[in-house]
Amino acid sequence: KNTDQGSYSTQLANSILNVRTNLDIDITSSTQVKVNLSGKLKEKYSPGSISDGVLMETLYALPANAYPVRSHNGIWGGSNMYPKNPVAESSSTGYTTSHARTLLADLTLTQDLEALAPGLSAEFRIGFDAYSETWDARSKQYLYESNIAHLDNSGIPTDTVNTQYGKEEKQLGFNSWLNNQNRHSNIQFALNYQKDFSQSNLFASIRYKQDKNVYLGQYNTYMHQDIIASGHYGLLNKYYLDFSIAASGTSRL
């Protein structure tokens, strides 16, 4: 907690909210729908101008006696050789907030087509996933100083030279940006046929699939399309024949 500024905190914190539901609905005796929804909201608070990794690197690289946390003048300690004071970097440079949102949704519709032909059914699926992450940064600089003592021939301090760096800012600057974003959509349609005979069984299917991914940035949209036909025949639970044929295409926009 930043004790010098009561209006905000630089304490690391995470807030997460998850929501999920799964529905199985029988619309009619021959029509079923399945719906799956999942949502997530996440907020993360962290010190303003230094990441977790850089902070740990600074702690490992800084000698234990390089300078005090604060000088005798009450100013943050520092030096020209080691300018980053880990305590000051984590408590006096403001704070950042990240907002991440995730949505996962899919729907499956199954239709029995026994009225047209025994063993015939159709299936339709659609899915949509979305993710975005935005960052808000409220940052400022801080004043720090180095104290170098001049010693006489006996090793007794005679004078201290104080050199100040940086500047003390009272107001927080603001910056906001979209750090990451992607969307994924999927559509499938299938026509299935299944028939059991006295000594054999048959299954055949034809399926169309379209998959689209949109990432952050220009020319980062990918589209995939597939048409797949497959079949299975079993005789006496002993002899089997399978086949599959597919056509696929990919484009980048």
Label for each model-derived stretch:
Residues K1, T10-K84, G94-A100, E133, ...:
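Flexible loop and strand-edge segments within Gram-negative outer membrane beta-barrel domains
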Residues S30, D112-A122, W135-A137, D196-L202, ...:
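Short loop/turn motifs that connect adjacent beta-strands in outer-membrane beta-barrel proteins
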Residues N2, G39-E43, L104, Q111, ...:
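Transmembrane beta-strands of outer-membrane beta-barrel pores
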Residues V33-V35, L120-I126, L202-I206, L241-F243:
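Transmembrane beta-strands of outer-membrane beta-barrel proteins
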Residues K84-S90, K167-L172:
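Short glycine/proline-rich turn/loop motifs
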Residues V19-I25, A105-Q111, F189-Y193, A229-L235:
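Residues on the lipid-exposed face of transmembrane beta-strands in outer-membrane beta-barrel proteins
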Residues D4-S9, N22, S90-T96, T108, ...:
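Extracellular loop and loop/strand-boundary signature of outer-membrane beta-barrel proteins
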Residues A64-G77, R138-R252:
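Outer-membrane beta-barrel transmembrane domain signature of Gram-negative proteins
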